[in-house]
């Protein structure tokens, strides 16, 4: 059984944000950011379960050369929270950036283990306008449930475990096709 403590994840006012993560987010130049929270799983481009690489590419392609660009905040890691893992994630992001030409929007990496109060402040920070995740498959989708308690929009795939609590009334659901693997 998955669930979460509504005393840990809940809507917050800007004046209630107190952890160092809020100061980090305050330093981001964009006032409109999308947020993705989840592990960057193993697999080549388009093969990782969370489809993080595809999300990065779609974000870059969608907002390149726009006069006013949003930011993308990735709260992610690979298999660990080590310095090597962080460098590996940055290499993956930079490789995708090199494949997209133009004036690209900014991507911000938050790497490491966060406490629940820090994650809740991340979901509730005023620069975070929507949670986005184009996952191929979730057992449950805990970050999607956590972020849903902030009351902000969620943009995600219209399939998998998170459909137990997300629907077209509380989310923007992206349709797709199942493929044999």
What does each of the following model-derived ranges do?
Residues 121-139, 149-153:
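Acidic donor-binding loop of glycosyltransferase active sites
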Residues 153-156, 172-173:
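Short hydrophobic beta-strand element within catalytic cores of glycosyltransferases
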Residues 1-10:
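Short beta-strand->alpha-helix junction loop in the catalytic core
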Residues 141-144, 159:
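Short glycine/serine-rich donor-binding loops of glycosyltransferases
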Residues 11-118:
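Conserved catalytic-core segment of nucleotide-activated headgroup transferases in glycan assembly
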Residues 46, 134-141, 163-164, 180:
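Nucleotide-sugar-dependent
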Residues 118-121, 162:
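Acidic, amphipathic alpha-helical patches
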